[in-house]
Curated annotation (Swiss-Prot):
<feature type="compositionally biased region" description="Low complexity">
    <location>
        <begin position="117"/>
        <end position="130"/>
    </location>
</feature>
<dbReference type="Pfam" id="PF02309">
    <property type="entry name" value="AUX_IAA"/>
</dbReference>
<dbReference type="InterPro" id="IPR053793">
    <property type="entry name" value="PB1-like"/>
</dbReference>
<dbReference type="InterPro" id="IPR033389">
    <property type="entry name" value="AUX/IAA_dom"/>
</dbReference>
<keyword id="KW-0804">Transcription</keyword>
<comment type="similarity">
    <text>Belongs to the Aux/IAA family.</text>
</comment>
<feature type="compositionally biased region" description="Low complexity">
    <location>
        <begin position="52"/>
        <end position="61"/>
    </location>
</feature>
<keyword id="KW-0539">Nucleus</keyword>
<feature type="short sequence motif" description="EAR-like (transcriptional repression)">
    <location>
        <begin position="12"/>
        <end position="16"/>
    </location>
</feature>
<dbReference type="InterPro" id="IPR003311">
    <property type="entry name" value="AUX_IAA"/>
</dbReference>
<keyword id="KW-0678">Repressor</keyword>
<dbReference type="GO" id="GO:0009734">
    <property type="term" value="P:auxin-activated signaling pathway"/>
</dbReference>
<protein>
    <recommendedName>
        <fullName>Auxin-responsive protein IAA13</fullName>
    </recommendedName>
</protein>
<dbReference type="GO" id="GO:0005634">
    <property type="term" value="C:nucleus"/>
</dbReference>
<feature type="region of interest" description="Disordered">
    <location>
        <begin position="52"/>
        <end position="93"/>
    </location>
</feature>
<feature type="compositionally biased region" description="Basic and acidic residues">
    <location>
        <begin position="62"/>
        <end position="81"/>
    </location>
</feature>
<comment type="subunit">
    <text>Homodimers and heterodimers.</text>
</comment>
Amino acid sequence: MAGADVDVGTELRLGLPGGGGGAAEAAAKAAKRGFEETIDLKLKLPTAGMEEAAAGKAEAPAAEKAKRPAEAAAADAEKPPAPKAQAVGWPPVRSFRRNIMTVQSVKSKKEEEADKQQQQPAANASGSNSSAFVKVSMDGAPYLRKVDLKMYNSYKDLSLALQKMFGTFTATGNNMNEVNGSDAVTTYEDKDGDWMLVGDVPWQMFVESCKRLRIMKGSEAIGLAPRAKDKYKNKS
């Protein structure tokens, strides 16, 4: 068999120069290509077919990415437009309406001030007519009473009311003989904290300055009358 191969390789053939070697060259190239591909596969190198397949796969994602923006734009075009928010202060207020609103606000302020001024005298009047309750105590009595001084118009009215409350005679006045001869005398504490006899000042001054009343023994109230006189003389 080896001899036959040698004969084929060394066999002389008839033909044009260079025309007889075409088949041999093609066979040699095919054998070389097969040898190179075998080596590439063993070394895990990419062959020509593998490179073409990879290029095809790379082109497919690029085409899909190019399609996505176009599809998103088409979907946005199909959506209805969002409603526009109404601007604050729209529609604009005309000038004459604005002037009317300004005049109304000024009028309301003036009316409020007028109402306050009208209410102020009424509040003062009600305050002046308010009650003036004071406590009344009597030495030896086991209870206290309260009287509204503004319910009486004079010392005489107050004395009669106290007699009904405590059932005893109470002297009011700055006469020392009256104080000495009475069993009980009505005194009061003023705003300064001083104790004085009831009746030693004008009635209205007494009502404004009295804090509380006390019915005490006449012997204990002897020194109060002169002190009350001196006090109000100095004030006058």
